[in-house]
Amino acid sequence: MLSFPAEVTNVQATALLQHLVEQVAAETGAVLTVDASAMERFDSSALAVLLQLRRDALAQGKTFSVKGLPPRLRELAGLYGVAELLTAAT
């Protein structure tokens, strides 16, 4: 499981994405789960990172899900029309 930090804004997004993409490649399971429960401060860059991780996971034949997506980020995803792409982990 990959974990997001408390803050994911444009300032951190590029470095975070590079770090997490490496971890996606190293994940051996069939499901890639991202834990977003620690996120407190974020902007739309957090969605961009999540969506890129989803693309990478799907390209590797993995299922993608998000655990603990903050309600405000879920609302933002809805506004952008991508909420259905961020499936909740069970």
Please describe what each predicted stretch is.
Residues 1-45, 52-90:
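STAS-like cytosolic regulatory interaction modules
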